[in-house]
Amino acid sequence: MNTVRVAFLLVFVLAVSLGQADKDENRMEMQEKTEQGKSYLDFAENLLLQKLEELEAKLLEEDSEESRNSRQKRCIGEGVPCDENDPRCCSGLVCLKPTLHGIWYKSYYCYKK
């Protein structure tokens, strides 16, 4: 029984003494890895920043090209009176003189083509 205790104690002492020596090496390895990780993170951050700046430039360029005059003006729906000289009927509609109802109004209305 004493031999088992002595053997166990010997293994325990060796493990502790060698483990502390490795502890310093592990600490140095961890410092190197964190420094490498920081440089990698800085590189990835710069790359992401460049991509975001390019995307922002494209979006601002598209906004500057679009003006208020390029928007579609409001249109007149089906069955609504329109002006013969300036028809503002929606797409797919035509400004025509009414055939049956509305003859007495003497006005033009938007109808489907």
From Swiss-Prot:
| Record's function text | Probable ion channel inhibitor.
Annotated tissue distribution? Expressed by the venom gland.
UniProt signal peptide: 1-21
Disulfide-bond pairs as recorded: C75-C90, C82-C95, C89-C110
**Which parts of this chain are annotated as the region Disordered?**
61-83
InterPro entries, from UniProt? Toxin_22
Q: Pfam families of this UniProt entry?
A: Toxin_22 (PF08092)
One molecular function GO term is: toxin activity
Per the record, what is one GO cellular component? extracellular region
Q: What is its main location?
A: secreted
Protein name, per record: U11-theraphotoxin-Hhn1a
Entry remark concerning the domains of this protein: The presence of a 'disulfide through disulfide knot' structurally defines this protein as a knottin.
Family according to the record: Belongs to the neurotoxin 14 (magi-1) family. 01 (HNTX-16) subfamily.
What is the species of this protein? Answer: Cyriopagopus hainanus
Q: Where in the cell is it found?
A: Secreted
Residues cleaved off as propeptide: 22-74
Superkingdom of origin organism: Eukaryota
Cite the entry's keywords alphabetically. Disulfide bond, Ion channel impairing toxin, Knottin, Secreted, Signal, Toxin
